[in-house]
């Protein structure tokens, strides 16, 4: 269910992400070079489990900003409760937290752009990292890439009246990747089948 590591890496190459370090499981070692802009896609589970949920992280050294993007916009408590995942571990393992002053800005997504039963988390991570590549000072919002999707307060994730927003977001994400990724275009039907809006329900 969802996107494989090979798929995400192939689409990331098409998007020409700056210093994309790759895809990782929850043991991601963090950003080891504080002076270079870089980004990665990280799963909340160990690799041997097959994975659960994709997140994106990015580091902008000019402003010393660490970006943490979760397509569901879960709070720290929810991430720990639902996935047993704490992004603080990423910071502690990163060189950006090992510098003498340890001074940085953390910017974390707080709204949901992905529907509750969608398996497109990896694709939304690519969308965010494409925004980071183009607009590293404001990748979360107020740029032409992330403005393609609309955020919803996380506590409304399951509300019926916001589900059309999630459908439109997923279609916008597919359309963006179709424009910018040859790999997505070549494998569109398989990718969409494995990530569609109700994929999680199919697995129950």
Curated annotation (Swiss-Prot):
Q: Site annotated as Cleavage: where? A: 50-51
How is this protein induced?
A: Expressed in the late phase of the viral replicative cycle.
Q: How is its activity regulated?
A: Requires DNA and protease cofactor for maximal activation. Inside nascent virions, becomes partially activated by binding to the viral DNA, allowing it to cleave the cofactor that binds to the protease and fully activates it. Actin, like the viral protease cofactor, seems to act as a cofactor in the cleavage of cytokeratin 18 and of actin itself.
Q: Where in the cell is it found?
A: Virion; Host nucleus
Tell me the GO BP annotations in alphabetical order.
Answer: proteolysis
Q: What is its main location?
A: virion
Enzyme Commission code(s) on record: 3.4.22.39
Could you say which enzyme class this protein belongs to? hydrolase
On whether Disulfide bond is a keyword of this UniProt record, the answer is yes
Q: Which domain of life does the UniProt lineage start with? A: Viruses
Keywords of this protein's UniProt record, alphabetized? Autocatalytic cleavage, Disulfide bond, DNA-binding, Host nucleus, Hydrolase, Late protein, Protease, Thiol protease, Virion
Which residues participate directly in catalysis?
A: 53, 70, 121
Give the UniProt entry's GO cellular component terms: host cell nucleus; virion component
Any single GO molecular-function term of the entry would be: cysteine-type endopeptidase activity
Q: Which reaction does it catalyse?
A: Cleaves proteins of the adenovirus and its host cell at two consensus sites: -Yaa-Xaa-Gly-Gly-|-Xaa- and -Yaa-Xaa-Gly-Xaa-|-Gly- (in which Yaa is Met, Ile or Leu, and Xaa is any amino acid)
Q: What does this protein do?
A: Cleaves viral precursor proteins (pTP, pIIIa, pVI, pVII, pVIII, and pX) inside newly assembled particles giving rise to mature virions. Protease complexed to its cofactor slides along the viral DNA to specifically locate and cleave the viral precursors. Mature virions have a weakened organization compared to the unmature virions, thereby facilitating subsequent uncoating. Without maturation, the particle lacks infectivity and is unable to uncoat. Late in adenovirus infection, in the cytoplasm, may participate in the cytoskeleton destruction. Cleaves host cell cytoskeletal keratins K7 and K18.
State how it assembles: Interacts with protease cofactor pVI-C; this interaction is necessary for protease activation.
Record-stated family: Belongs to the peptidase C5 family.
Q: What else is known?
A: All late proteins expressed from the major late promoter are produced by alternative splicing and alternative polyadenylation of the same gene giving rise to non-overlapping ORFs. A leader sequence is present in the N-terminus of all these mRNAs and is recognized by the viral shutoff protein to provide expression although conventional translation via ribosome scanning from the cap has been shut off in the host cell.
Q: What is this protein called?
A: Protease
The source organism is: Porcine adenovirus A serotype 3 (PAdV-3)
Per the record, the gene is: L3
């Amino acid at each position: 269910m969802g996107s494989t590591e090979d798929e995400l890496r192939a689409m990331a190459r098409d998007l020409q992400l700056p210093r994309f370090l790759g895809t990782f499981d929850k043991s991601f070692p963090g950003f080891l070079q504080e002076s270079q802009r870089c980004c990665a896609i990280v799963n909340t589970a160990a690799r041997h489990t097959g994975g659960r949920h994709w997140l994106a992280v990015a580091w902008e050294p000019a402003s010393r900003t660490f970006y943490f993007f979760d397509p569901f916009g879960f709070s720290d408590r929810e991430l720990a409760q639902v996935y047993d995942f704490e992004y603080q571990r990423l910071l502690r393992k990163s060189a950006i937290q090992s510098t003498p002053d340890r001074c940085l800005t953390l910017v974390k997504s707080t709204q949901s752009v992905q529907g509750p039963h969608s398996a497109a988390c990896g694709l939304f991570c690519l969308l965010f990292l494409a925004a980071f590549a183009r607009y590293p000072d404001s990748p979360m919002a107020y740029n032409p890439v992330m403005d393609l999707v609309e955020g919803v307060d996380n506590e409304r994730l399951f509300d019926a009246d916001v589900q059309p927003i999630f459908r439109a977001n997923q279609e916008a994400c597919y359309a963006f990747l179709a424009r910018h990724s040859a790999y997505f275009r070549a494998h569109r039907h398989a990718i969409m089948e494995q990530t569609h809006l109700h994929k999680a329900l199919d697995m129950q």
